[in-house]
């Protein structure tokens, strides 16, 4: 066991690096007195919720305004002096000090990207200082649940330059016996889907998250393709591999109407559209089926589908306990997407997960469309026993890095490892069995 003095924060450094879209992002390194180092890189999103914590960008001509040197400077000039001398084991204090330094509701002074980079790097430094893997440090000795991956194999919306309005069409290989088998199942369907697209003369170019980005007639056509790919790969739709959607409906919502596919829908009509898709396909999860501030629409959707389908709030909740508590109080949605950079610190992320768990809401640990080689969310999914992870398709190294880390964790756990399977989707998952 490391001496407590060895776990004190000695030095904090930061630099500007690139994410998977070639845009700048923040990397932080935390060095402890005993020599242990933690490094973390923050992601960024394309379809960002209006209520997310503020991502600080430089503006100006450099990197077309997307530079993050201000955030880097905040880390080295403001955050580092305040944190050096604190114990890396006291994550809550570290994050609280940064939050107080910023002194805004949305972290707009220092930037959520600067605060989060240091927050995650501190946790990793502490884990390294103790000689523990990150999932074990954050979750304790009982953390052994491997998540079901929600694999985004057809990209649309803000994640691709095609005509699909819905943002993500995902595979859910819940019928596997292990995470390793689930990954194999997803990969086999992914490659079968590529062959199908080629046979139909459709594009096999990939979008931001590594899924294919073909032009298709409709959202239903994407569902038909996935069903065909699942069957041709030798799996049973609904029994072994189901589907999930990220509608990202805020992106096409304006003046009380949902406008896509050449049509305009009221909230009530949008709910019926989604119900029709659920009846047509084995859909176990729908993310952001309604817009981020259409609370009345969300109420209708939850009443209509909430007993049988996981209804995930992403833009709706933005990993924020205040918005999640409103959803809980008003019986809206039944699941929350967890994105560390939406709220901007590890402590607040864990608080959101804890609130969801206490309230019988499922959690889905998620990447962003602008990702990096950082694998923190893989460890976080195991540490928190979330049971579900979204980290893209079966291509692009920044996506596959998280899958590979989960493979390592599963191997390390050995016989202790449990694959979440359908149970990972909570009560609604069991209804699908």
Swiss-Prot record:
- CDD domains registered for this protein in UniProt: enolase
Residues binding (2R)-2-phosphoglycerate are 167, 339, 368-369, 390
- For whether the record's keyword set contains Chaperone, the answer is no
Q: Where does the record say this protein resides?
A: Cytoplasm; Secreted; Cell surface
Q: What keywords is this UniProt entry annotated with?
A: Cytoplasm, Glycolysis, Lyase, Magnesium, Metal-binding, Secreted
Q: Which InterPro entries match?
A: Enolase, Enolase-like_C_sf, Enolase-like_N, Enolase_C, Enolase_CS, Enolase_N
Q: Which SMART domains match?
A: Enolase_C (SM01192), Enolase_N (SM01193)
**Where along this sequence does the record place binding of Mg(2+)?**
246, 287, 314
BP terms from Gene Ontology: glycolytic process
Chief subcellular location equals cytoplasm
Q: Which SUPFAM superfamilies match?
A: Enolase C-terminal domain-like, Enolase N-terminal domain-like
Known catalytic reactions: (2R)-2-phosphoglycerate = phosphoenolpyruvate + H2O
Identify the GO cellular component terms for this protein.
cell surface; extracellular region; phosphopyruvate hydratase complex
Task: State the source organism's domain of life.
Answer: Bacteria
Q: What EC designation does it have? A: 4.2.1.11
Query: What is the required cofactor set for this protein?
Result: Mg(2+)
Single GO molecular-function term? magnesium ion binding
In the UniProt record, does the keyword Kinase occur?
no
How many cofactor units bind, and how?
Answer: Binds a second Mg(2+) ion via substrate during catalysis.
Q: Which residues are the active-site ones?
A: 209 (proton donor), 339 (proton acceptor)
What pathway is it annotated to? Carbohydrate degradation; glycolysis; pyruvate from D-glyceraldehyde 3-phosphate: step 4/5
Q: What does this protein do?
A: Catalyzes the reversible conversion of 2-phosphoglycerate (2-PG) into phosphoenolpyruvate (PEP). It is essential for the degradation of carbohydrates via glycolysis.
Enumerate the PANTHER family for this protein. ENOLASE
Family, as annotated: Belongs to the enolase family.
Q: What is this protein called?
A: Enolase
What is the taxonomic lineage of the source species? Bacteria, Bacillati, Cyanobacteriota, Cyanophyceae, Synechococcales
């Amino acid at each position: 066991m490391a001496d407590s003095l060895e776990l004190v924060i000695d030095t904090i450094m930061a630099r500007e690096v690139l994410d998977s879209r070639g845009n700048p992002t923040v990397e932080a390194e935390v060095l402890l007195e005993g020599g242990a180092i933690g490094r973390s890189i923050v992601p960024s999103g394309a379809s960002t919720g209006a209520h997310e914590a503020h991502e600080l960008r430089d503006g100006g001509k450099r990197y077309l305004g997307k530079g993050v040197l201000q955030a880097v400077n905040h880390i080295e000039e403001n955050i580092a002096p305040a944190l050096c001398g604190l114990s890396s084991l006291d994550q809550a204090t570290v994050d609280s000090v940064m939050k107080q330094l910023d002194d805004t509701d949305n972290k707009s002074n220092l930037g959520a990207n600067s605060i989060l980079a240091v927050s995650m790097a501190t946790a990793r430094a502490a884990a390294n200082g103790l000689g523990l893997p990150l999932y074990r440090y954050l979750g304790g000795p009982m953390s052994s649940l491997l998540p079901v991956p929600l694999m985004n194999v057809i990209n649309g919306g803000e994640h691709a330059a095609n005509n699909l309005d819905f943002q993500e069409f995902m595979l859910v290989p819940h019928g596997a016996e292990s995470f390793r088998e689930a990954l194999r199942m997803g990969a086999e369907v992914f490659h079968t889907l590529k062959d199908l697209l080629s046979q139909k003369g459709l594009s096999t170019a990939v979008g931001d998250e590594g899924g294919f980005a073909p032009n298709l007639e409709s959202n239903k056509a994407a569902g038909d393709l996935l069903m065909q790919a699942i069957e041709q790969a030798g799996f049973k739709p609904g029994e072994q591999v189901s589907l999930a959607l990220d509608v990202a409906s805020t992106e096409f919502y304006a003046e009380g109407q949902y406008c896509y596919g050449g049509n305009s829908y009221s909230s009530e009509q949008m709910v019926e559209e989604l119900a029709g898709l659920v009846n047509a396909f084995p859909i176990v999860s729908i993310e952001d089926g309604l817009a981020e501030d259409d609370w009345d629409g969300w109420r209708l959707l939850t009443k209509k589908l909430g007993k049988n389908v996981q209804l995930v709030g992403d833009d709706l909740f933005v990993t924020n306990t205040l918005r999640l508590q409103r959803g809980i109080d008003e019986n809206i949605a039944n699941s929350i997407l967890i994105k560390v950079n939406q709220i901007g610190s590890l402590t607040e992320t864990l608080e959101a997960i804890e609130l969801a768990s206490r309230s019988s809401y499922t959690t889905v640990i998620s990447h962003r469309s602008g990702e990096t080689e950082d694998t923190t969310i893989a460890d976080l999914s195991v540490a928190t026993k979330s049971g579900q992870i979204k980290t893209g398709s079966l291509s692009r190294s920044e996506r596959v890095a998280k899958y590979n880390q989960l493979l390592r964790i599963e191997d390390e756990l050995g016989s202790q490892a449990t694959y979440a399977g359908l149970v990972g989707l909570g009560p609604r998952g069991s209804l699908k069995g």
